[in-house]
Amino acid sequence: NAYDGFRIFLFYLFKKIKFYWTLSLERKDKQSLYEFLFYSRSLYIVLSSMNTILDKNLSNILALKFKDITKKTQDILASENSNQDLLLFLSDEKIQDLFNDFDFFIKENSFYEGDCKDRFFKQLVALELRKKIILFRKNILKNFDLELFENSFFELAIFLEYFYRFLEIKNLNKLYEKYCKDRDKNIFSKIINNKNKFCKLLKKSSKNLKIYKG
């Protein structure tokens, strides 16, 4: 069910962000920090997207804290004094406090008390992924905005990275492998240059995901 599936997923993300937090402190290199950024952003997106499984108020608070970490990490990566800024930021007690709080909450049964906690995990993932596909396609076709495009693409890519195999849908596999696997910004120009083909694939994927509607 959603309760068990989501708990396992959050443990996985938490283990990853802690690993790259430690690695960033040890190595002080941008590659480790980019990975740390990826998982902080993943946690923000997942906690804010799937809060129907969780205590809504608490998950929203945690999501905003990971959003703040994401923003600060992006600023450091763009800074000329990135090494010094990185150490000050990652050594901040606020991050350790957040990790301690998060570690506590994901182990607590009361954290998983959302309205949909007893539904099937696969169904909830499919519905959320379909929603992201529809919104992303709408943005490309009707109301293109670069910042919104980048944000909605990343949200879609995050869910595909973790769940495209889990849902066993060929069009999702194709969507991930061809367009969402690389985190390079060049992928945006590839999508725009192949907009019609890409949007057709999004439409097919959305249609495939309807089988989980229930």
Residue ranges and their predicted role:
Residues 1-214:
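Function-determining surface determinants
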